[in-house]
Amino acid sequence: MAFRKENKIKNNFSKIRITLASPEEILENSFGEVLKPETINYRTYKPERDGLFCERIFGPVKDFECHCGKYKRIRYRGIVCDRCGVEVTEKKVRRERMGHIHLVVPVAHIWYFRSLPNKIGYLLGLPTKKLDAIIYYERYVVIQPGVAEGLSQLDLLSEEEYLDKLDEIERTHKGNQNLEDTNPDKFIAKIGAEAIYDLLCRVDLDSISYELRDRANTDGSQQRKTEALKRLQVVESFRASKGVNRPEWMVMKVIPVIPPDLRPLVPLDGGRFATSDLNDLYRRVIIRNNRLKRLIEIKAPEVILRNEKRMLQEAVDSLFDNSRKSSAVKSDNNRPLKSLSDSLKGKQGRFRQNLLGKRVDYSARSVIVVGPELKMHECGLPKDMAAELYKPFIIRKLIERGIVKTVKSAKKIVDRKEPVIWDILEYVMKGHPVLLNRAPTLHRLGIQAFQPKLIEGKAIQLHPLSCTAFNADFDGDQMAVHLPLSNEAILEAQLLMLASHNILNPANGAPITVPSQDMVLGLYYITKLRPNIKGHGLIFYGPEEATIAYNEGKVDIHAPIKVYVEDYENGELVRRMVETSVGRLMVNEYVPKKVGYVNEVLGKKALRDIIGSVIKICGVATTAKFLDDIKNLGYYMAFKGGLSFNLADVLIPDEKDQLIQEGYTAVEQIMQDYSMGFITFNERYNQIIDTWTHINGRLSNVLIKQLSSDNDGFNSVFMMMDSGARGSKEQIRQLSGMRGLMAKPQKSGAEGGQIIENPILSNFKEGLSVLEYFISTHGARKGLADTALKTADAGYLTRRLVDVSHDVIITEEDCGTLRGLLTTELKQNEDVVASLYERILGRVSVHDIIHPTTGDIIVRAGEEIREQAAQIIEDSPIEAVEIRSVLTCESKKGVCAKCYGRNLATNRMVQRGEVVGVIAAQSIGEPGTQLTLRTFHVGGIASNVATENSLLSKYDGILEFEELRAVDATDESHQVVVSRMTELRIADPNTGIILANHNIPYGAKLFFRQGDAVKKGDKIIEWDPFNAVIVSEVAGTLSFEGVVENVTFKMESDETTGLKEKIIIESKDKTMAPYARIIDENGEMLKNYSLPMGAHVVKDDGDTVKVGEILVKIPRSVGKAGDITGGLPRVTELFEARNPSNPAIVSEIDGEIGFGKLKRGNREITVTSKLGEEKKYLIPLSKQLLVQENDFVRAGTPLSDGAITPADILAIKGPTAVQEYIVNEVQDVYRLQGVKINDKHFEVIVRQMMRKVEIVDPGDTLFLEQQVVDKFEVMEENDRIWGKKVVIDAGDSQVLKAGQIVTARKLRDENSMLKRKDLKIVKVRDAKSATASQILQGITRAALQTKSFMSAASFQETTKVLNEAAICGKTDYLEGLKENVICGHLIPAGTGLRDYEKLVVMHRDDYEKATAERKSFLSVPTAEPAMEEAPSE
């Protein structure tokens, strides 16, 4: 065997390249050829020579022992045995040594002709079908036509045609087949992968590239153009990887054999073997290859050979990718064998199973129990577990102290658990924290560090306050313990991961270690006041006196008393009298002085705020102590108060019967209206549901009122709810109000369930009847099923989010951008959803912010907006602030600190190296799982709110209308609004400042006019909440056109009343569309209305109508039950940038609406701008139009119903609008569930979705049209080409060619040279830069298109990503987190930042000594000019 250099791979590489393997490379990495299909000898269990497990090729099976046993022991290391040829070395080389198989005929690699896009096919310009025919030996392909007539390259021939051709040529040109292959006259046609190999060798990439580029630019047919561009991409990737890739390497002549220990063969008892599938696949290849060798040697007929060659091709195919073939090779029990590709793919593949998720040593797991007496940073660790985890440290100490001499005896002592080890263990554990982790780890607070305390027993003790972060409870949860070993790891655990440092939630900056349950209840109980009890109204000179009085039993803990206390006012400590209670004094003993005196009832919310302010004012250490103190107080007081409840505490209000009676009466009235035919079936349904929702709401209010006054508010059930310890209004309503309306079971999970109109009137205290119970079960079970299914969805969403954003790291302090986002407060109707304060807090301002009234500068440009400044801005008249945002950050890699703003987990500006991408992904993904787990708590109750149907003024002011068209109703005192885009503003009568903005729905009744003054509480407008309507704007006679029974409408008679109604249906005759017209006495048409599908026509043909009368009602969809079950898919839809199922058609310009004629079931609508530009849209008749003729619309206004697609927003309103749209829409889904997540997390993800642009016109750059590239790459390429010239006519120049791109300088030199020689000079034009349009990618696509191929491959579609990367010869620069984890490097973030790698940590004295030596070295005089003194590190 040839001498081989040790090729250990160093682990300090900084990039990885993937290319096609050439046959030479495979041979270079191989240790020998595998010739036989045998694996091991079944009697001796020794590997067969030259077989798949051969020791000569792959190395010895036992450490330092050759096959025949001549050389044993380590002293013969490196010797090759002269008898059996095995090198004496360690057995682990069998994990890294490769072999190879020499194939008799070349074989095409399945990845390159069976995956889409078809690489070999695109290079040769052959369709997949033809390619398969060649590769699987069905057709000959002409490689060089030579003298043959009527044939060209790449023509396919059947066998007969081929043989005929050969005979013909032999007749006309004798000896043609004996010419050299290089002779252009020779006719060459081949079959199988050999033919493909020859063709690929002959491919001239450059000429194909020029030809295709030309075709893409000039071809008129769109299809041929796309085809050319697709082929061009494959050709260009090969050109880009010139020098490392040759096209013919897609056909293999040598196959590598992976090391035997990676495809083990294990003998089981009973003489059977368990083996890896790969061995079977390799065996088939070797058997077929050997058989083919023999057949060729004995000169078998062509037919037999061809069959054998085809079988070899198939064997190799199934070795590389068995799942891609239609006829996969199956094992004995009909299971497809696992090929090489399958072992990379999926959750069980190499990437996800072994590289990204490894099992680690020094870990333990056990059940958790609560440890109420622990401090915030401590956890209880069972003794036995600790002894095992800290074993090496204990052994070292045992030897150091001289208790034992050898490691072996020390091990025995530890294993026997001798008493001497316990105090050593105590000593070793000091300052050596452990990491606790609870699965599923949904966010970074799922792993925290604690200082362990030894405890008896076998369960881990966990601090009760850190349960929220872990989402742990003590009903049998288990947790894992990990031990950090190196000093750096211990330091990081102590300084960054200690539980007492992780008090804030990175998702929203609110404290996450908030007391819950018992603690809250205890604190709430003692801080609640109770009038008229012992000691009410007493006055004390200080807290001490009050405490003494309490201890003496002179004053009750709840009694309102007056006390002098110290309080902070404007930063000063002052003594003042407050009305408070002994309980509140107790709490304030623990509240840090700087926070001031807390004088309120402490519920969960109040506690969260207090903890937040303690952190801001006093820092983390104080907060940790404060938390422990109130935890102890809370537990103690909950115990002292004896706060449990019995059945009598669950009160049922006396008004219940009366309210239910009211409900019945109202429903009866509705049914009567319905049977008289005043209202439609849907209206009846909606009104009934509404009635019961109202009744239920009123009952709840009565109930809560009664509970809160029961026993002076000290009703246990009420206290539990009010403090936020347990239970919600909903649950109490079900306990003692009524269960309310339930959702109907429905078949598909698509649309929200309808609601059963008979409510459940009983509550749980009274007990449900059998029917009620039966109805209830559906909700409960649906909840449980949803939970199980949705957890997986949420987990998958998190995974995609992490994958798309894991390389977003803070890379620099300031990217220097001048752009930002204009931020205002978010309103829905009238309610502020997110205040300006919340949205700008902790962000960086783009400009100086100046107070409009005083003219002071509040915040300078580039400064963080802190709490105080944000509050000033909130209180001032400033409406909008421009803030720096991740969305506008211009860093090439990652984002910059100024654009990100404050790190929510620390409340300070974010530092370089913070992994904001992963934090964003976790913050968004974690509540997804939480929320889906919460669906069943409300038991499927239909929680829809009673619909509003009128607008009351909230202010005194003057009304202003914009774009209002209204008609006076004939016989009433109001107007009816007939315009669609009407805005109503209420302005302050004195200053004219707008107080409120409202949109007025079409068809609403209007009770005031422009400029009227309104008082607070006046009803301005009123509308029908259940129906959209069409109102007559003129008086006249009604006439219908195109309203034909069973073509455009059907009569529906109501089951109960027998009244008939016309309902417009989708027109069966596409030329006909239903219209309603109003005509005057002379038969002139005054107004024309088109009737949408599903409309109920209220009037009949020939009826006289008055102004403002309703002609048509279009029922709005029925009340749906809400669950985040609707929410999660919505979030996914937004992040994947999917188009909704029925998208709205949107106007692209501002303009006036005109109606055109009908075309094939579509109505044509034109929008004409003021400048006369016209756009036409075709809208299906089945869709409801949202605009009327002559309406004025703005760009981006939907013309038909449906959701607007993000792509439309991007195209019409630009990137900023679509970014804001996605962020706000996703936020809405989470807000609906009451989950707070900071905007910046969504911005990080949306930034990643908008990284890429699509090339519209490549100009003279290297890009292709329709190619998708990174924004920054386009900018760089355009900068590179800027100012350069393109040669049009090379003149007499020897150097330049036409089409070449040159710098102006080179051109000047060349032309001046030509001028001197009086030759023709070079003509040029300016180089054209590329133009590109921004595109929006879904997170899955964005993740698959990251720069790093390793990150993409480990995410999804592994084989596709890898084979495309290999063709391009891609280099992975290991910039993200995943790639580095896969390579086993430290991640380039946090403490692993590449800048810190070169840091040398030394003692100060050593450092000064070293610099002094360096200085003296540098100051030695030399002949050369003195060196500049290097700045000291």
From Swiss-Prot:
Protein name, UniProt field: DNA-directed RNA polymerase subunit beta'
- Names of the cofactor(s): Mg(2+); Zn(2+)
What is the organism of origin for this protein? Porphyromonas gingivalis (strain ATCC 33277 / DSM 20709 / CIP 103683 / JCM 12257 / NCTC 11834 / 2561)
GO biological process annotation, one example: DNA-templated transcription
Gene that produces this protein: rpoC
Write the Enzyme Commission number(s) for this entry: 2.7.7.6
* Reaction catalysis annotation: RNA(n) + a ribonucleoside 5'-triphosphate = RNA(n+1) + diphosphate
Protein family: Belongs to the RNA polymerase beta' chain family.
UniProt binding sites for Zn(2+) 1 = 66, 68, 81, 84
Residues binding Zn(2+) 2, per UniProt: 815, 889, 896, 899
GO terms assigned for molecular function = DNA binding; DNA-directed RNA polymerase activity; magnesium ion binding; zinc ion binding
CDD domains registered for this protein in UniProt = RNAP_beta'_C, RNAP_beta'_N
Going by the entry's taxonomy, the superkingdom of the source organism is recorded as Bacteria
Per the UniProt record, one Pfam family is RNA_pol_Rpb1_5
The answer on whether this UniProt entry bears the keyword Zinc reads yes
